[in-house]
Amino acid sequence: MVKPLALDETTLEAPEWRISDLPVPYEEAVKTMEARAAAIAEGTAPELVWLLEHPALYTAGTSADETDLLDPKRFPVFSTGRGGQYTYHGPGQRVAYVMLDLKRRKPDVRAYVQDLERWLIATLAEFNVTGETRPDRVGVWVKRPEKGLTAEDKIAAIGVRIRKWVTFHGVSLNVEPDLDHFSGIVPCGISQFGVTSLADLGHTATMADVDLALKKTFRDVFGRG
C-alpha cells in the first residue's frame, strides 16, 4: 500500500468533494480555485477536491513552447499559472482540481506530485489498467505493445500550482474524450508518444464510475478523504 503523506489526523478535516455535472468554463474554474486556495491558506475553508469537465480548450503552462501549439484556432487557448506545457481539456476527460494544505500535510512539492501520480495509478487499477510513471516524463503512461515494443501512450496529465503551500490545479484523466482533439498541440511537449483513454483501451467506464474510483483511492494515498 502507498504510504500516505504525513499529517495530523486529529486536526485535519477531510477534504470537501465537489462534482460539477455541467462543463465549467476554464476562467471560472481558475477564479474559483484561486479563491478557495486563499481561503484554505487563511484557515477559513476546508480542503477541496473538485471533479469536473471543461468545454474543449487548450491550456499553456509556465513551460509552454509556442511551437507546440500546432493549431491555435481550433479551440480557445488559455495561459495558466500551473506548471507544465500545453495540454487539452474537454468533454470525456475527468479533471480533478486538488486544493490541499501541504503545510499541514507535508511541505514537499516533489512528494506531492508523486502522490498525484500514485493516486491516478491506483484509480486506473480499479479498471484493470496498469498505469506507470517515467522519471523523465510527468504524468501516467500505459504500454501499447500492439503498436510496437517500446510504444507508450499518456492517459493522465498533471499540472500543479502551489501558493502559500496550498495546492491548486491538479490532474486530468482521459475517460472517453475525442483523442483527435489532442492533435492541435504537442501534448506536454512530448511528440514521440501518443495519448489514450479508458475507452481507447477497451474499458467502458462512466464518469460516475471514475469519480467513485478517485474517491476510493484518495485516502490510501493522501491519508484523508
Swiss-Prot record:
Compartments where located: Cytoplasm
Q: Where does this chain mainly localize?
A: cytoplasm
**Keywords from the UniProt entry:** Acyltransferase, Cytoplasm, Transferase
Q: Pathway, according to UniProt? A: Protein modification; protein lipoylation via endogenous pathway; protein N(6)-(lipoyl)lysine from octanoyl-[acyl-carrier-protein]: step 1/2
* This protein's record includes keyword 4Fe-4S: no
- Residues the record annotates as the site (Lowers pKa of active site Cys) are K154
The GO biological-process annotations, alphabetized, read as:
protein modification process
* Enzyme class, spelled out: transferase
Which GO molecular function entries does the Swiss-Prot or TrEMBL record give?
Answer: lipoyl(octanoyl) transferase activity
Q: What catalytic activity does the UniProt entry give for this protein? A: octanoyl-[ACP] + L-lysyl-[protein] = N(6)-octanoyl-L-lysyl-[protein] + holo-[ACP] + H(+)
Q: Does the keyword Transferase apply?
A: yes
Q: Which GO terms describe its cellular component?
A: cytoplasm
Q: Any idea which residues are catalytic in this one?
A: C188
The catalytic activity of this protein is classed by the Enzyme Commission as: 2.3.1.181
Q: Which residues bind substrate?
A: R82, G83, G84, Q85, Y86, T87, Y88, H89, A157, I158, G159, G170, V171, S172
Domain BPL/LPL catalytic: from-to ranges? 43-225
What more the UniProt record tells us is: In the reaction, the free carboxyl group of octanoic acid is attached via an amide linkage to the epsilon-amino group of a specific lysine residue of lipoyl domains of lipoate-dependent enzymes.
Describe its function: Catalyzes the transfer of endogenously produced octanoic acid from octanoyl-acyl-carrier-protein onto the lipoyl domains of lipoate-dependent enzymes. Lipoyl-ACP can also act as a substrate although octanoyl-ACP is likely to be the physiological substrate.
What family name appears in the similarity comment? Belongs to the LipB family.
Protein name, entry field: Octanoyltransferase
To which species is this protein native?
Parvibaculum lavamentivorans (strain DS-1 / DSM 13023 / NCIMB 13966)
